[in-house]
């Protein structure tokens, strides 16, 4: 409308602009009225081209009283129009058509005159305080108790009650209003007991029945289904050293071992490597002080993770791979037995167990000459559908980078400590962080994924299948895994297992979180990092680190001794609360540890992964190798290239630290490029020279197989023993490939190829 009026006014005078009008209709924040400025003098164009003007013939102007009268009428008309127009604009809400016509925009207000300050940026101290406040008002024990009710117990993987709990977790995620909730399903093979009972029998030398020792209630998944007969030999915990210290050979014999110290799968693998024909596992009273001597228990014997019948690839229903079998499956029968059954067997054995074993007085070493043991295992394979449940809080800056927080959901028995606590922590953390985002102004830069895994009891099957399904891309997106399984098993100690990349973050967290019972900060020992234990095969964090190259951490509040009821029917809420009366406080502390991990990893501009920690790991390896310099020299080899690779890695970390120091922290593009280099450090310690299918745990520090640095050292040690077991060809390959893996990690950390200063 205004443009038309101005156009008409201009055309009246032959198109020459004789005046202009400027409006400012925006209401000021301080409440001043809008105003109008009008000029009726002819403004000359100051920047016009004089030569152009000279060539333009201006039309003749009208003259006399008619012309002046016309001007006066138009001026008074415009003044009246403006007064009415502005009066209308004052009567409407901000951001109306008036403002848009005027070309200005007023601040958005909910009520006239009300002042709204801009949202304050939340810093570390703010977020830490908000997390603590939410933790104080959270009832963890109520949720743990709920998950231990009959509708969810027992919840063996693939069962209806496992699915019931999966749907409950999924619904809870939706109620928490996470950014997105989804599930994935896999069809996997597990092993279950057959209708024909497993048995342990004492027989005479002719194989005739003396008496039945036990039909065990528990079993060991992935055992070979077979019947074997032989003498029984005790091998303590079944570690490699335990077998080395035995005076009695175990070839052709059944081995009996105590539970604890290492996984069932490792015990079985050690026994099988020495040609044992079967393994029995029991819980002694010294290490597991359980009153009920008849208590049975469960475990698995797969020396690996995931579905052992789809090794290295995911168990999706639409993939049709040829029949395959993990090399980690045992070829001998394995069975758990009760303590009462073990004592019956000891009654038919001779020789006291060594005093340094520190076990029960009833322990004996080997069956008498007239007796043998017959072991029958009849387990069968069963294909089941499992569900993994996910929820995500999307990041505000880098949503494609995420930290994963996960917990096992299934359990062979009630699973209060084994999976109930972890699932409760997962649900409460998801709820708290969603509230912090929706209500408290928390804006994580990176995404947070909450994952509920199934079939964890069978070797982290659900978690591993997910990793296998996204092997090619996950390391570019997921930069940390936080495991909540078995986070509360006691109160005396705080223990942690993790990638070295997370050591600095763990230390800062321990300096901020207090022990739930003593009230002292968890950080009490400056040398704590040297006492960190390696992630074990039965920990869901292990495949993240060793298979996918994703930094991972697992922690627990626990005792010096093992929690006795894991994998048994006594893993109930009742037993848990009796052993840990301050369960809610301890669960709160565990949630605070995990919560602070999440905040630091998703909020800070610089990724909290300390890549320089691997310098110490490499230096330690080189020092160990230097002890064998003479042997290496005798083979005509040199360590010079290994030294060079380690030096390149050290220089790459120093250069990256300098780059971070020089970077403008507000430049998101630059910071993302630097963070991307840090994210790939762990991944580049996966050996590129072995197949994920044949050797899934490719990490040269934390994996398993001949490609690892510990395996290289073990092979080299055999040369000094001079027993013909040393394999020089293997060692040459190990040294070369280890060197190039370290060099590759250094090159990747350096950045672009033109930034690599390499005279290797």
From Swiss-Prot:
Changing residue 640 to A: No effect on binding to transferrin. >10-fold reduced affinity for HFE. Induction: Regulated by cellular iron levels through binding of the iron regulatory proteins, IRP1 and IRP2, to iron-responsive elements in the 3'-UTR. Up-regulated upon mitogenic stimulation. A motif (Endocytosis signal) lies at residues 20-23. Residues 1-67 are cytoplasmic. It is found in: Cell membrane; Melanosome. Residues 223-313 form the PA domain. Stearoylated by ZDHHC6 which inhibits TFRC-mediated activation of the JNK pathway and promotes mitochondrial fragmentation. Stearoylation does not affect iron uptake. Residues 1-67 are annotated as: Mediates interaction with SH3BP4. The keyword Cytoplasm does not apply. The modification Phosphothreonine is found at residue 21. The keyword Disulfide bond applies. Changing residue 622 to A: No significant effect on binding to transferrin nor HFE. It is a single-pass type II membrane protein. GO terms for biological process: acute-phase response; cellular response to leukemia inhibitory factor; cellular response to xenobiotic stimulus; intracellular iron ion homeostasis; intracellular signal transduction; iron ion transport; multicellular organismal-level iron ion homeostasis; negative regulation of apoptotic process. The modification Phosphoserine is found at residues 10, 19, 24. Serum transferrin receptor (sTfR) is used as a means of detecting erythropoietin (EPO) misuse by athletes and as a diagnostic test for anemia resulting from a number of conditions including rheumatoid arthritis, pregnancy, irritable bowel syndrome and in HIV patients. Cellular uptake of iron occurs via receptor-mediated endocytosis of ligand-occupied transferrin receptor into specialized endosomes. Endosomal acidification leads to iron release. The apotransferrin-receptor complex is then recycled to the cell surface with a return to neutral pH and the concomitant loss of affinity of apotransferrin for its receptor. Transferrin receptor is necessary for development of erythrocytes and the nervous system. A second ligand, the hereditary hemochromatosis protein HFE, competes for binding with transferrin for an overlapping C-terminal binding site. It is linked to Immunodeficiency 46: An autosomal recessive primary immunodeficiency disorder characterized by early-onset chronic diarrhea, recurrent infections, hypo- or agammaglobulinemia, normal lymphocyte counts, intermittent neutropenia, and intermittent thrombocytopenia. This is Transferrin receptor protein 1. It comes from Homo sapiens (Human).
């Amino acid at each position: 409308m205004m443009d038309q009026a101005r156009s008409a006014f201009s055309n009246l005078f032959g198109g020459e602009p004789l005046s202009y009008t400027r409006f400012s209709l925006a209401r000021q924040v301080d409440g001043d009225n809008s105003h109008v400025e009008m000029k009726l003098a002819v403004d000359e164009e100051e920047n016009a081209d004089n030569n152009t003007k000279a060539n333009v013939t201006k039309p003749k102007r009208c003259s006399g009283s008619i012309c002046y009268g016309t001007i006066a009428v138009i001026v008074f008309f415009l003044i009246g129009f403006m007064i009415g127009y502005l009066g209308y604009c004052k009567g409407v809400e901000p951001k109306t058509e008036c403002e848009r016509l005027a070309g200005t925009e007023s601040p958005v207000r909910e009520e006239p005159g009300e002042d709204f300050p801009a949202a304050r940026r939340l810093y570390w101290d703010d977020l830490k305080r908000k997390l603590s406040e939410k933790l104080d008002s959270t009832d963890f024990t109520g949720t743990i108790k709920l998950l231990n009710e009959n509708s969810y117990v027992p919840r063996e993987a693939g069962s209806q009650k496992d699915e019931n709990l999966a749907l409950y977790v999924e619904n809870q995620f939706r109620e928490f209003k996470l950014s997105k909730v989804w599930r994935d399903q896999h069809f996997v093979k597990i092993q279950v007991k057959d209708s024909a009972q497993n048995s342990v029998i004492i027989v005479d030398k002719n194989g005739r029945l003396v008496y039945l020792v036990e039909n065990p209630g528990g079993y060991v998944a992935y055992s070979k289904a077979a019947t074997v007969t032989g003498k029984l030999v005790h091998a303590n915990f079944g570690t490699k050293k335990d077998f080395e210290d035995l005076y009695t050979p175990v070839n052709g014999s059944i081995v009996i071992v105590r539970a604890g110290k290492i996984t069932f799968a490792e015990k079985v693998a050690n026994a099988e490597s020495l040609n044992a024909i079967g393994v029995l596992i029991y819980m002694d009273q010294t290490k597991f002080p359980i009153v009920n001597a008849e208590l049975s228990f469960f475990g698995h014997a797969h020396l690996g993770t995931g579905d052992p019948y789809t090794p290295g690839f995911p168990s999706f229903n639409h993939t049709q791979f040829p029949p395959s079998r993990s090399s980690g499956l045992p070829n001998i029968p394995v069975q758990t037995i009760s303590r009462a059954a073990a004592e019956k067997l000891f009654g038919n054995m001779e020789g006291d167990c060594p005093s340094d074993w520190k076990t029960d007085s009833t322990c004996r070493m080997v069956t008498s000459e007239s007796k043998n043991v017959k072991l029958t295992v009849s387990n069968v394979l069963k294909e089941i559908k499992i569900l993994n449940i996910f929820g995500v809080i999307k990041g505000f800056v880098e949503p494609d980078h995420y930290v994963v927080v996960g917990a096992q959901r299934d359990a062979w028995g009630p699973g209060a400590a084994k999976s109930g606590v972890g699932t409760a922590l997962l649900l409460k953390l998801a709820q708290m962080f969603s509230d912090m985002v929706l209500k408290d102004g928390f804006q994580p830069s990176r995404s947070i994924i909450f994952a509920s895994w199934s079939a964890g009891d069978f070797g982290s099957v659900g978690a591993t299948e997910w990793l296998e399904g996204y092997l090619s891309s996950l390391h570019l997106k997921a930069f940390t895994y936080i495991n909540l399984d078995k986070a509360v098993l006691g109160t005396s100690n705080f223990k942690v297992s993790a990638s070295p990349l997370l050591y600095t973050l763990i230390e800062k967290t321990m300096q901020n979180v207090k022990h739930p019972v003593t009230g002292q900060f968890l950080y009490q020992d400056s040398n704590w990092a040297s006492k960190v234990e390696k992630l074990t095969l039965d920990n869901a964090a292990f495949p993240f680190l060793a298979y996918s190259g994703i930094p991972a951490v697992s922690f627990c509040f626990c005792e010096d001794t093992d929690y006795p009821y894991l994998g048994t029917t006594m893993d109930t809420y009742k037993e848990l609360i009796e052993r840990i009366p301050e369960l809610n406080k301890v669960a709160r502390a565990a949630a605070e540890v995990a919560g602070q991990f999440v905040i630091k990893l998703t909020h800070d501009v610089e990724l909290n992964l300390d890549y320089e920690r691997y310098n110490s790991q490499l230096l330690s390896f080189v020092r160990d190798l230097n002890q064998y310099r003479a042997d290496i020299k005798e083979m005509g080899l040199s360590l010079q290239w290994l030294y060079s690779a380690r030096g390149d890695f050290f220089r790459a970390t120093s250069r990256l630290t300098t780059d971070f120091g020089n970077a403008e922290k507000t430049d998101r593009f630059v910071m993302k490029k630097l963070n991307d280099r840090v994210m790939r450090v762990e991944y580049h310690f996966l050996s590129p020279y072995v197949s994920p299918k044949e050797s899934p745990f490719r990490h040269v520090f934390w994996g398993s197989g001949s490609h690892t640095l510990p395996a290289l050292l073990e092979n080299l040690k055999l040369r000094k023993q001079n027993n013909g077991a040393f394999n020089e060809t293997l060692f040459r390959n190990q040294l070369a490939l280890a060197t190039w893996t370290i060099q590759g990690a250094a090159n990747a950390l350096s950045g672009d190829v033109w930034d690599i200063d390499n005279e290797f």
